[in-house]
Amino acid sequence: MTEAKLTRGHSCVPCQHRKIRCNGQTPCAYCIRTGKECVRMRVSPSHSRNARLNHRRLTAAQTGSPSGDGQVIVSGDQRRYVEDNKLWKSLGDEMQGKDVSPDPERPPLRTRTDTPSTEVNLIFSHQRPTSISVKYPSAVHSFQLWQVFISNVHPLTKILHGPTVQKDILETFSEPTSTPGPTEALIFAIYLVAVVSLTDAECRSRFGEPRKDLLARYCNATEVALSKADFLRSTDLRVLQAFTLHLLSLRHICDHDILWLLTGLATRMGQRMGLHRESSLKDLPPFEAELRRRVWWQIVILDGRASQLTGASMNPNMQLYGDTQQPINLSDADLVPSASTIPQPSPITTDMLFCKVRIEIGVWMIEQKCLLGSESESSTTGKAKFFKAIDELERHIEEKYLANMDKELPLNLLTAYLARSAVCQLRLSVYHPIHRPERASDLSAEQIDMLLENSLEVIRYDILSHSTPALQCYLWHIANFFPFETFVLLISTLSGRPAGQVVDTAWEVIDQVYEHHPSFVSDTSDPLYWALGNITLKAWDQRVTSARTRGITVPRELPCIANLVHARATMARASSQQPSTTDVSGPATPQSLLLAQEAPVDYLGGLGTTNELASQTDLGMATGEELLGMMKGVDVDWDFWQQLLDGNGHDARARDDQETFYFSSFINKA
């Protein structure tokens, strides 16, 4: 056996894959023990990177792309990017070295009304910068919050470099009052989003305080720190990172229209710094440039999701998002601030996997907006092209990211669920009646077959995400993406088909959804949840009635049905006990409350147990002809559902915190 050779390179590929410490020898101890080939990634030569940059600059010059028309104005650590502005560009050389952005460490500039921007802030109202010192947690709690962030949040965002920020946090333990303003804003934003990722029970167990109190404290501290850093005029990357994390926290309780405006603000802040242009990053160290790419693409994802929730259209023009390259597939351990070059993308999955897949799917959706034009909406050819593009996307994601990943790692598992669910939802989007209500009755047997198969698949992935113990740390994120449109479609298709294997399987899936989302039953004040319960009870009632009419065995009542009936009966009794002087000008009680009062007498409560999730082989359980009557069995007002979905999207946990989570005007009062 040859003598082990000590190396100074990165961890070997097998150790990176298993996320364990490599002892730095060739072969290393792990590879010797497991018999694996001990290989290390090669660092790309600098000339390759320069060649790519030169090629992009040449391409931009030949095509007239605005990516090469901008200019970076630098003053110390401050960087401002200007483009398509003849005045600023003509004076660019004269401005080099001039303070074009305020220094967060000195008194802020005065506005024309002689009011300090840090004292009267357009976004956060009046703040008191001197009060932030009392918001710092103890050293023990501070490090616990950091560990929660690294475990629950960082793998899903990747907008900062973990090892670097950890040093900053450790330095605050000894002298927190001397922490630079931008760093302080970033640290408190980390604390805030870490608390958002925890349950109330976890907060009480770890920190001895209710979750709502911790949220209020760190939200206020983050806003104060951002105001102190004069974030509206800052070009410091740490300030933008802090604001982006703050937006991630706000999306759990914030009014969607306001959140969309705030993500637009983050987009403008990034554009001012040139994050959307690859040419603005060429003179930065490779580490800094890569970090800016990560921040920019997370902002693009945030803004795109906010646009969906508000019903705003997404401009298919890619120039809106610039030409910044996607971040490369590297773990934090492979990014070294002092490195003169960036290593080649890892040939294996890294902790960037989730973000990489989200970015690739997001970019694909933006590009395909052009394909989903009038042609695809009105012609068979357009739909065929779109389905072919979806198949190609699915094949690309599977082969590049999912085929060889370690399925034992929770992040990889979540990524697989996300990617496969997204592909199914893309297929559903072509024929989903909620997008074309006037054509809901014109669907063919094959189209209904496809709708049911893919809707079941999407809902199953949500159930798997909630029922897998290893993914509990990511539920704060998963809860924001429940596929309401798909769930409504699944329930509505069952109303016209009361019996059969496919229906039995679908109802078991529906029951598990209610099991993992108890707020769908308990939160009777939410109009969307109330409507979901009504359409579920209506579909179940049709199933029971049909069984009796045909003289077959009445299906066993599911727990979700018993719970929905009980919730409505309880609300009906409470309403009947209200004084007759009740103000009738308020929100009306949903009309279908009568369904609970008129429910069949054999609703005895859910005494049975929920079956395990059906196997994937159950997806093709019925032919399109058998399913053809499903869409005609219930009269669904898809415009009504679209209005409900546009006005909803909060997680029940976040809704419970609204009474005490102080975000001034950000709270959705609905």
Curated annotation (Swiss-Prot):
GO CC annotations on file: nucleus
Positions with biased composition (Basic and acidic residues): 92-113
CDD domains xrefs: fungal_TF_MHR, GAL4
Function according to Swiss-Prot or TrEMBL: Transcription factor that may participate in the regulation of the expression of the gene cluster that mediates the biosynthesis of aurofusarin, a red mycelium pigment which is acting as a mycotoxin.
Disulfide bonds: none
Stated name of the protein: Aurofusarin cluster transcription factor aurR2
Species annotation: Gibberella zeae (strain ATCC MYA-4620 / CBS 123657 / FGSC 9075 / NRRL 31084 / PH-1) (Wheat head blight fungus)
Gene Ontology molecular-function annotations: DNA binding; DNA-binding transcription factor activity, RNA polymerase II-specific; zinc ion binding
PANTHER family (UniProt xref): UNCHARACTERIZED TRANSCRIPTIONAL REGULATORY PROTEIN (PTHR31001), ZN(II)2CYS6 TRANSCRIPTION FACTOR (EUROFUNG) (PTHR31001:SF85)
Source species taxonomy: Eukaryota, Fungi, Dikarya, Ascomycota, Pezizomycotina
Main location per the UniProt record: nucleus
Location of this chain's protein in the cell: Nucleus
Region ranges (Disordered): 57-76, 92-115
Domain of life: Eukaryota
InterPro entries: Sec_Metabolite_Reg (IPR050613), Transcription_factor_dom_fun (IPR007219), Zn2-C6_fun-type_DNA-bd_sf (IPR036864), Zn2Cys6_DnaBD (IPR001138)
Induction info: Expression is regulated by the aurofusarin biosynthesis cluster-specific transcription facto aurR1/GIP2.
Listed Pfam families: Fungal_trans, Zn_clus
Keywords: DNA-binding, Metal-binding, Nucleus, Transcription, Transcription regulation, Zinc
PROSITE patterns: ZN2_CY6_FUNGAL_2 (PS50048)
GO biological process: DNA-templated transcription
Residues annotated to bind DNA: 12-38
